[in-house]
Amino acid sequence: MSDAAEAPREATGENGETEMKEEEEPNPNYKEVEDPQQESKDDTIAWRESQEEERKTGEEEGEEEGKEDKKIVMEETEEKAGEVQEKEASGIQEETTVEPQEVTASMIRLETQITDSQSITSGIFPKTQRGSKSKLSLQLEDAETDELLRDLSTQIEFLDLDQISPEEQQISSPERQPSGELEEKTDRMPQDELGQERRDLEPENREEGQERRVSDIQSKAGISRESLVSSTTEDILFQKDKSTPVYPLTMTWSFGWNSSLPVYYIREERQRVLLYVCAHTAIIYNVFRNNQYHLQGHANIISCLCVSEDRRWIATADKGPDCLVIIWDSFTGIPVHTIFDSCPEGNGIMAMAMTHDAKYLATISDAEVQKVCIWKWTLAVETPACTLELPTEYGVQNYVTFNPTNNKELVSNSKTRAIYYAWYEERDTLAHSAPLLTEKTFNKLVGKFSQSIFHLNLTQILSATMEGKLVVWDIHRPPSSASTFLGFPYIKPCKLVHLQKEGITVLTTIDSYIVTGDIKGNIKFYDHTLSIVNWYSHLKLGAIRTLSFSKTPATPPTEKSNYPPDCTLKGDLFVLRNFIIGTSDAAVYHLTTDGTKLEKLFVEPKDAICAISCHPYQPLIAIGSICGMIKVWNYENKQYLFSRVFEKGLGVQSLTYNPEGALLGAGFTEGTVYILDAMSLENESPEPFKYSRTSVTHISFSHDSQYMATADRSFTVAVYMLVVRNGQRVWEYLARLRSHRKSIRSLLFGVYLDSNEPRLLSLGTDRLLIEYDLLRSYKDHLEVLDIHHTDQGCYPTCMVWYPPLTRELFLLICNSGYKVKLFNATTKMCRKTLLGPAYGSPIEQTQVLPVRSMAELQKRYLVFINRDKVGLQILPVDGNPHKTSAIVCHPNGVAGMAVSYDGCYAFTAGGHDRSVVQWKITLSVLEAAVSLGGEDLTPFYGLLSGGREGKFYRELEDYFYYSQLRSQGIDTMETRKVSEHICLSELPFVMRAIGFYPSEEKIDDIFNEIKFGEYVDTGKLIDKINLPDFLKVYLNHKPPFGNTMSGIHKSFEVLGYTNSKGKKAIRREDFLRLLVTKGEHMTEEEMLDCFASLFGLNPEGWKSEPATCSVKGSEICLEEELPDEITAEIFATEILGLTISEDSGQDGQ
């Protein structure tokens, strides 16, 4: 574990394996093409013109010119290939020994010499020498290039990776192929002759030909043979160009950190750089520059991370479905290798460690039966070198580390068992030893293990316990023998050392010291005999979570040095490296040992963050945590301004600035409401309001700041108002009302347009939209103005005022069925139902993006969050799937959202991941996606099975036009009137014919939507609909994922009872009674007619053609047709006639 061990310039690892090299050389021939795509386009035009000229000059002249060019190409290819081969032959000999600082395997091979933005926006073109004849060519359809690509891909698979430069892999993509002089020669001959000539040029020796062609192309294009990873320096990470974003939402900053994971000190010399984790992102933070670089790639919360001894390589792993292990280059921020399916049986990675030379990675899975794997990640392999399943009686192993001097030895521990591992690579065996310790072992209480390390003497292992003790294990290694195998090594408990009273939380080594950190914030240093050398107990820290020492050795003491003396009899100076301290209360400190200077780098919330709010006209964001802390940041310059920590038991649940930005309303978990001064966080009112017994989830201010309303978990709305008392304006409690039966999802103030008076509305999961009459309310009485039901089956999730894009004022309400509904703000009539963003879960919160100028008033956008994503939606909503975009922001759940006053940034709070993420909004990218998605009905055809030419759309057309015949009479002899429209009365029948069965309420909503669609503008009602509009109505109203078996099961869970087989069922009598008495109940005649059709006694659509009627509903005997007991499966298959898919349980027809 020693941080002092510097990798030598050249060193060969164990078993003859080469280690990685530290030297980096900048590439002198590295210039940027300003517009490679334009140059490529010009080259393409020139090539085509030359082709036309060649055809006009005649075939004979072309043949002669082709022969001359063939000779030139052959001579130049042979000359340059010979030179390159000589250089490569000598270079290979020089590069057989590689050091830990240089990437091996997939890392060097996967990276190209480009910036992040170019890799996305420019098709990953390599950079070429400006001013030379080398250009980017898009003409790669010739036989030679195709063959070269095939040859290279084959060669990369079978050759040693150190013998292939990253540029050779660049050529494997046609878009990356540089042409240089080769392109100029192709311009002067017909393409068929060129292809034949290049086939003639193919060398007989395949390998020599590949090397020769690759080297020739590289030399002509001016491509460096070094990748960005291998040629970079430590300073490049924070010098990357900030190019135009290519995503609508781009992470720019992350507030907070996961204090349950370590923080690493990865650089110190000229810049103090830390590594820590926020949610699913690893953060490289430059303290001096106040910059962050985000390592994004995980879809789940990062569960563990580790770094190499030289701090060059970072490994991160996550927990969850499709978990990943990613190795990063800390100099460039590039992911150099990814391990997929590292634990397919489990739920992710529990613990992870990297060897000091960064060759090997050890992981322990988070599964019921844990698996230890060792990965040779530098070889880009997809499977571990060895694996070991651990018995469950060993407990959950949550910590692992390698022997710093032997890559083949590891130690891990759970709370009750420490395990020693010995890796026999030649045997593909991971031997282990895990003696059981009990109180009888030492006749003393041992305590629960926290961390284990290898002793400095390398013959022992130390395990720290939460009782302040160290268990010393002796390692018994059998003597080495070349002829016979003498058994595996094992460990035995040697002694129990009671070091201190406080529980030890961190155990590590540095230089010649053994270091401990404990629950009281003490840091102690011991020598190899476990005699104390020095300690820091006066720092007043929380429980130590992590200690990370600088990779730079301590400077030797001078006359100006102020190192403290150690506690030995000699009293020598205690010379130690600087180090980073992370504590369990989410604080990070830097300790400069020369002079013992402790600097607080940051203190973040140590508990869930649920409340955030942006200032209405300044770049400020207030962040509230369940731990009782409110912090205010300037989010433009990323500067922490001020904070307040409330007394224990007060957790911040909700925050809102008032419209003037002078006040900050804060709701707490135990029901208290504070009104704070926005610039000092001091109490604005003498005493907080305590009118609720449960957590205050919502706070809202009226537009004139005369009213403040709150909602809590007991479904209660409370109103406070500003009054004048003794010449001073003070806040007073007005009234409260338990107006909902289920949780309140939104609390919203509005304005009456005719009087400019505030109006207050609340929305609950009980499907009630309630408006309150503030003017008629008085002390202890909150008057209700009206109550409206918003939906039938789905429940509402949030609401917001729809921006004035139309002459009609709307409330926008999202529901759990992925729908967005527009309600008239006055009548509360549902005026439109539209398909909203469907990204795995419904929208939970939404806000209208503020405009930045008056010119943007007619182009508005929504920002929304669902369970784990943040997204944008272009208004007006019309069901076009291309008008929305989303990105994962907090995999374990989003707790809150805020938008900056200028609409440039969105902020998301991650709840229990203790982080807030700032997202830069780039609307032009989203608009570009819409334009690429097509116009008119093109985006909507993609929502149909088979699209515009599919079977489903053809059936829809047939039913649409058949409904015209039906409305005119099936048996009529009059001349048919063919039209592009059908009357509205036919719409429900066509809907049902294509598999969508809307309720009567939904049918009324559809009729209102169509009838009044143009009423505000024209004053006319619409009584017909054409096919394109019908298609949009159908797609916007139908369930986005169809009818599923799980939905039927949920209904039977509510209505049924558990039968003798353990399934939910409904008795036949109850089933029939429910159909005629509950919900939108049928008449008995309607029910019998439906059963007649379902049982095949009458053909489908028989009422449209009365002549086909054979059986009346009254003639059916339901006792004979229906079973006594109906389960969900019987209802779906035997009654409705549906088929159930085997895998997902979804209905098919």
Curated annotation (Swiss-Prot):
InterPro entries: EF-hand-dom_pair, Quinoprotein_ADH-like_sf, WD40/YVTN_repeat-like_dom_sf, WD40_repeat_dom_sf, WD40_rpt, WD_repeat_EMAP. Keywords: Cell projection, Cilium, Cytoplasm, Cytoskeleton, Flagellum, Repeat, WD repeat. Residues 1-138, 161-219 are annotated as: Disordered. It comes from the Eukaryota. Pfam families: WD40. WD repeats lie at residues 335-377, 385-425, 436-475, 493-528, 531-591, 595-635, 641-678, 688-724, 731-774, 785-825, 831-877, 883-921, 959-999, 1019-1059. Involved in spermatozoa motility. May also regulate cilium motility through its role in the assembly of the axonemal radial spokes. This is Cilia- and flagella-associated protein 251. It comes from Homo sapiens. The gene is CFAP251.
